[in-house]
Amino acid sequence: MYKTIFTLFAFCFAPLSFAQSCENNANALVARYTVDTHNARGEQQKLLELWRNEGVVAHRYPQTQITEAWELVNASLIKPTRYFDAHARAIEYQPGEKVHGKSETNWSFRNQLFSDELIATMTETSRTGSGCNTLITFEREDNGTRLTLIWQPALKLATSFTAESTHQSVHWTLTNTEFDKQQIEQFFAERYAYQSTDFADIGDDHTDPFLTRMVHQGFIEKAASGYYNSDGDALQGGHQH
């Protein structure tokens, strides 16, 4: 009798524990992507890493040694920080302060790379697997570009994304995912230890060689339309070269 009762309790609570495990994994992970672009200029591959740790998310671009991070202060405030990994330096922004010409308000875009709003505009075409391993394929036609997203909802993670048009194809591939909490905390701790400067104070300090060089090269420029595009390419003075 006791064995039967225990079995029933285990059966009732197992799905809840399973769901909690999925959620815990989604909140602390590192996902690594390759981004392959093919167009008239040829083929190019870049790398992108997505790091999450309980309300903080970072995009690391190995090719430029830049890490962009965002902290969810509350439901409506997001605090951005840009880390220059090669120099162990950081530029901090206040919540609500404009970065790339606008204030950060869309947490799902930063946390997932593909926002809830974008996914909501796409059509589900197939679904495979179950539980944490469920994969959903979404598609959308957008001004001559066909978008295909393979989505893992339990982890809020893209496993594949393709944007194809007559002029260009871009393909994102998830190469690996890790859930090593110690590794993740070390990644963020290393960057928290960088020498940090508030963005509002950059123009007041003319003695810092790093800041002077970055401003001169256009890596840090107030009112620029952006410093790095979504692939992590440096933008000189707000314009792509």
Identify the role of each PLM range.
Residues 87-149:
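Surface-exposed, polar helix/loop patches in the mature regions of secreted/periplasmic/lumenal proteins
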Residues 58-65, 79-83, 129-195:
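Gly/Pro-enriched, hydrophobic low-complexity segments
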Residues 16-55, 193-229, 238-241:
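N-terminal leader/targeting segments and the immediate start of mature chains
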Residues 44-114, 170:
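An acidic-aromatic
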Residues 4-13:
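Sec-dependent N-terminal signal peptides
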Residues 106-115, 183-204:
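Short, surface-exposed secondary-structure junctions/capping segments
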